[in-house]
Amino acid sequence: MKHYKWAKIICLLIAIGLTKACDYDLSFSPAQTQDIRFSSDTVYLDTIFTSIGSSTYNLRIYNQADHNIKIGSIRLDQGSDSQFRLNVDGMHGQDFNDIEVLANDSIYVFIETTVDIKDYAANAPEFLYNDQLLVDEQTVELITLVKDAIFLYPKREDGFKEMIPLGTDEEGNAFGIEGFYLEDNELIFTNERPYVIYGYAGVPSEKTVRFEAGARIHFHDNSGLIAAESSSVHVLGEQSADAEMQEGEVIFEGDRLEPFFENIPGQWGAIWLTAGSTNHIFRHATIKNASVGILMDYNDETENPTLVLEQTQIHNSSAVGLWAKTGHVRAVNSIFGNAGNASFFGNIGGSYEFTHCTFANYWNRSFRSTPAVILNDYVPISETEDFVMPLEKAVFANCIIDGNQTVEFGVEQKGDQELSFSLDHTALRFSTADETIYENPYYDFSSSTLYPKLILNKQTAFHQPSTNDFRISQESEVIGLGKSTHAASVPVDLNGVDRTNLPDLGAFQHLIFEKED
């Protein structure tokens, strides 16, 4: 009986509480102009490509009053014709009425847009699209810049996307990668409009794709460029008069234009130079935010380099900047920057020649256990077997090999033939208390064959390495340490500055920067 009595009392208390709660009624007054404050009077949505949706941006509407208010209307000035989309306090639409906001509280308005530039400015390369968000009698400007672009993507037939064949598996089944081969009229990329590529754009056999000065190439996620057997890639950028505008540079990057994505690695796949492709030239090119900047499967077995890099920069690769498998590469005035693993991986041997190049890995997005530069002669093909090819040559002349690790140069041999490399008038970051590392004979820094002129553990004083600015300042300890005969073959630096008189190491002659307070 006692339990029954307590149950009756509890039920009675709950009933009284519910009755009082129902008596408590929230009241809302019509919002006055002075009650409302906005987090911004203008919402700038970052640049988008035509017909591609933007990221989501937010505006906060504050109730500054000590009482509850009801906003009569939140709507777009252009109404149903507007290309902006709204989400107000969790509700989608373009016109909202009687929105309640508690005293000293706020609500969010989320804003997106998709604009087809042809609906507003036919043949224009870009168009500034705007509308107004009307909040009762107050307004907030909505602005976005829309860029026209050329879109290239795989065809879809019967629900299947076009594929580029890569080979067959052990059972004889064909496999490939989502992509398409460029048509003859698509093999020249100009600077008239940016290009947006979905999937892998394939260069057909016996064809050459040409990227002219100022071309802008944007790859979607899991997309890239692939060169088939006997095909070539020619990137023919020019020295830019304006270092910020980079009007002569050919730039390969992702298709997200918002500032947040400017230095985000791994936004797209790779520039893939398959085995049998030949005569690749990259001049005044910037390759940024890929998984692998350039993936090179093999060399073309000729006396000439299969890949020539001149004034080329590879930045923010989530895996490797330049990954050359038995490659034949010649590079001058080039930068191999931040990467999740190696800036340059000379894998399964090959032949490499670098003059006035900067290898600098200041990766800070995750733990990195690999050095900036790796040379080896093998690849595992099973748990017990390696495929081996000799490292015929790897010359680093007037270069910098640096980073935020203590050891930025790795050499490993599995085959019988000794690896052939030399660091001549080259600065190297290599400092470790682990004496076992020096048991590797390739780290004998007294060897005049491997290290004819090694400059060890000097302060390079890069300007802003975390943001890919590898110019050296007046405080650098590698100023004037280059060999003049090496510099004579590359008489100007990456910015076109003469270096023949007193060459600094790396891709840049030093600059005098104003010290920040």
What are these regions (language model features)?
Residues 1-10:
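Bacterial N-terminal signal peptides that target proteins for export
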Residues 18-21:
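C-terminal motif of bacterial Sec signal peptides marking the signal peptidase cleavage site
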Residues 24:
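Short, conserved catalytic or interaction motifs in soluble domains
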Residues 27-28, 36-47, 52-53, 96-106, ...:
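Beta-strand/loop edge motif enriched in small/polar residues
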Residues 55-57:
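Structural beta-strand segments of beta-rich domains
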Residues 61-68:
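Asparagine-centered strand-capping/turn motif at beta-strand->loop junctions
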Residues 77-95:
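Short, solvent-exposed loop/linker segments at beta-strand-coil boundaries, enriched for Pro/Gly
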